[in-house]
């Protein structure tokens, strides 16, 4: 992610990406895509349903680290802290605290924790690791799923445990089908 001001909007690009609704470019419904974006909503919706959020990203080309906090369901967007950094590999990290009251709960439930953890594993399974080594973590623990096949194995076991049809239809889609008597997610 470029740590620079957007030439048209005069807003820092990370803030535009993560903190302002309808800022992506994937609005054409007839266009073939290899991503499943939600028209620029993504993490912004997480921030709207959170009491606190933070983004941290490294722009290794410009040698800048960008940190910005968001509070009160995205009602407060804090000024970013931008510092110089040299020789650091690029990454983006997001942190958030759900607004438990809005969800009608007092704190993190085991169901919510499991759902959030599953979504992180979903992301790890569909992230393209072929271009560069991308590390995905959940609560500072490395997620050891780097492809869709490993993701399937988490739920139904190895090919020896459970027969399946697993194909890559083209560069855009990968899918699997298995017959199970019982699946527990």
Region annotations inferred by a language model:
Residues 1-106:
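GHKL (Bergerat-fold) ATPase N-terminal catalytic module, capturing the glycine-rich phosphate-binding loop
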Residues 7-10, 70-73, 111, 146-156:
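Short secondary-structure boundary/capping segments
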Residues 31-40, 112-119, 123:
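Phosphate-interacting basic helix/loop segments used at nucleotide- and nucleic-acid interfaces
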Residues 42, 183-185:
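Contiguous hydrophobic segments
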Residues 78-79, 114, 118-125, 129-183:
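GHKL/Histidine-kinase-like ATPase module
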Residues 100, 104-111, 139-142:
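Generic amphipathic alpha-helical segments used as scaffolds and interaction surfaces in large
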């Amino acid at each position: 992610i470029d740590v620079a001001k957007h030439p048209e909007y005069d807003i820092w690009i990370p803030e535009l990406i993560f903190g302002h609704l309808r800022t992506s470019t994937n609005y054409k419904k007839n266009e073939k895509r290899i991503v499943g974006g939600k028209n620029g909503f993504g993490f912004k919706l997480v921030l709207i349903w959170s009491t606190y959020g933070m983004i941290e990203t490294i722009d290794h080309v410009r040698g800048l680290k960008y940190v910005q906090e968001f509070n009160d369901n995205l009602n407060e967007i804090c000024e970013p802290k931008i510092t110089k950094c040299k020789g650091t590999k690029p990454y983006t990290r997001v942190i958030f605290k759900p607004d438990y009251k809005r969800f009608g709960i007092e704190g993190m439930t085991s169901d919510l924790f499991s759902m959030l953890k599953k979504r992180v594993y979903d992301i790890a399974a569909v992230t393209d690791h072929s271009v560069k080594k991308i590390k995905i973590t959940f609560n500072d623990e490395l997620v050891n799923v780097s492809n869709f096949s490993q993701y399937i194995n988490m739920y139904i076991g190895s090919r020896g445990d459970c027969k399946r049809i697993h194909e890559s239809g083209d560069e855009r889609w990968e899918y699997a089908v298995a017959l199970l008597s019982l699946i527990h997610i």
